């Protein structure tokens, strides 16, 4: 028996030795950018943001990843005064009767708590910038409850986020003068953002020239206009809710995450039917990630592009990926000779 036991252990060891190495589990939060470095993750955000005080708040899903907290620490090490709102990292699992969505990782605390933090961050006169901890699901619910009369108009205050936060950015574009909307990285994105993208973020916020970035024409043509940037499915949600998103004369940058080709096609057709693209100067399709239908999505976009009757491009670095160039939605973008640039802001 002893001999058989030893033999069995040797056989198991041999099988395990020949087995492929276990692959790392994909981060459940698609907004988290995982650093490829094996060393301790660190990013230098000193002098990146043109402010002294930054507020961090959670408008939607609970930021469960450790990367979200690490992002806060990186801001602190960047010599910013960081005000983390009281409920930012409150785990909904510790509360009774909270929204525990069946889809893992998208639970959120009650909207009343999120709303309280939102008001607190916004109306704090010391806060010069608000960065969302993450998106997920829940911004639409928050916006349904916001009393805009309780928010001060702060056109110089930067409000940054993307993904589900696209909804808030759309509302800020509609309500011009409330804040300076920026489609850009959130707490979980900070930890793995490449140095080149951090430089691009700094230049975008400071008004310096950004680019050029090479893009691929689907419908050729030069164009210019202020940027409107966000998540495809949230643009569709906003239009269905009758948000008055100002796209006339602007360049629309669109990204997607966890979408099938059929869903992309339907959302694009719906947006066209709802006149989202009417009067736009151009459209740029960015990254579509976390999908097994990348080629099919590319085909859908290629077939859809000519129907818009305006210049259409693909390949700009924006979305749920490390290649994430933040975009200030108050700044003008230009596309010329298949290159995207944001000209320096005249002061």
Regions found by a protein language model. Give the residues of each.
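Positively charged n-region of N-terminal signal peptides that target proteins for export
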Residues: 1-4
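ATP/nucleoside-binding phosphotransfer catalytic cores, i.e., glycine-rich phosphate-binding loops
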Residues: 287-347
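Hydrophobic h-region of N-terminal signal peptides that target proteins for export
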Residues: 9-16
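Internal helical hairpin/lid segments
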Residues: 243-297
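Short, acidic/small-residue loops that bind anionic groups at enzyme active sites
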Residues: 148-171, 180-186, 310-312
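Short Gly/Thr/Asp-enriched flexible loops that form oxyanion-binding sites at enzyme active sites
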Residues: 135-154, 297-298
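Conserved anion/nucleotide-ligand pocket segment
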Residues: 179-240
């Amino acid at each position: 028996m002893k001999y058989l036991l030893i033999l069995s252990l040797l056989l198991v060891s041999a099988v395990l030795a020949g087995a492929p190495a276990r692959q790392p589990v994909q981060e459940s939060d698609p907004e988290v950018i995982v650093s490829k470095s094996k060393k301790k993750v660190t990013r230098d955000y000193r002098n990146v943001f043109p402010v002294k005080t930054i507020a961090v708040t959670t408008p939607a899903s609970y930021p469960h990843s450790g990367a979200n907290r690490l992002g806060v620490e990186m801001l602190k090490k960047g010599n910013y005064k960081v005000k983390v709102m009281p409920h930012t990292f409150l785990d909904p699992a510790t509360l009774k009767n909270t929204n525990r969505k069946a889809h893992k990782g998208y639970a959120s605390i009650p909207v009343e708590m999120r709303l309280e933090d939102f008001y607190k961050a916004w109306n704090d006169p010391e806060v010069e910038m608000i960065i969302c901890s993450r998106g997920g699901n829940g911004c639409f619910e928050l916006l349904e409850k916001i009393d805009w009369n309780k928010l001060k108009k702060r056109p110089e205050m930067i409000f940054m986020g993307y993904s589900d936060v696209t909804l808030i950015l759309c509302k800020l574009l509609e309500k011009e003068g409330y804040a300076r909307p920026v489609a850009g990285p959130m707490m979980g994105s900070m930890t793995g953002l490449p140095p080149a993208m951090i430089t691009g973020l700094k230049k975008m916020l400071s008004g310096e020239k950004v680019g050029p970035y090479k893009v691929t024409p689907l419908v050729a043509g030069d164009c210019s206009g202020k940027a409107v940037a966000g998540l495809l499915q949230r643009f569709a949600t906003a239009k269905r809710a009758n948000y008055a998103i100002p796209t006339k004369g602007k360049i629309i940058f669109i990204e997607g995450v966890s979408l099938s080709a059929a869903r992309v096609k339907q959302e694009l057709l719906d947006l066209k039917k709802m006149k989202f693209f009417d009067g736009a100067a151009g459209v740029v399709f960015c990254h579509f990630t976390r999908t097994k239908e990348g080629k099919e999505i590319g085909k859908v976009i290629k077939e859809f592009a000519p129907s818009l009757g305006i210049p259409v491009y693909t390949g700009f670095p924006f979305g749920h990926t490390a290649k994430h160039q933040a975009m200030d939605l108050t700044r003008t973008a230009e596309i010329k000779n298949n290159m995207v640039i944001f000209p320096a802001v005249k002061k």
